[in-house]
Amino acid sequence: KQNLTGLITVKDIQKNEDYPNACKDKNGRLRVGAAIGVSSDFMGRAKALSNVDVDVVVIDTAHGHSKSVINAVISLKKNIPQLSIIAGNVATGEGTKALIDAGVDCVKVGIGAGASCTTRVIAGVGVPQLTAIMDAVDVAKQQDIPVIADGGLRYSGDVAKALAAGANSVM
């Protein structure tokens, strides 16, 4: 009995040549992430995403150093241990430590650093982005947890500063 187990097209070959550094999983598929909040249906959403082999879930909130985010991370790691979790956003070493202790695989740093963001004003919480990155990295590097600098990137030099401050990546 003969079965078709795969199909490669000229377009597939061209994409591999054009994008040799594309981020792919062990099966050669592009990696996929999805953002969820911490509303009452977060677990159902995360399970549905895990069932379709999403690579990472991002718990995306304006202020990640909160009980709801920490409890969501703990619950997700307990119920879907294979799921990679990025959580944030935090602006302090303490917030970073709380998320790491809860079980995150990566921390997003930056509260209200974006040009159009009003989170600092509305929530009354925020730290200058470079300071937030350095404080988070000081804690995260002890546990070998990556840090994503999120926001405050208006000029190309801002990317260099975020990386120089220790962020593993920027968004």
What do the predicted segments below correspond to?
Residues 1-171:
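Alpha/beta enzyme core
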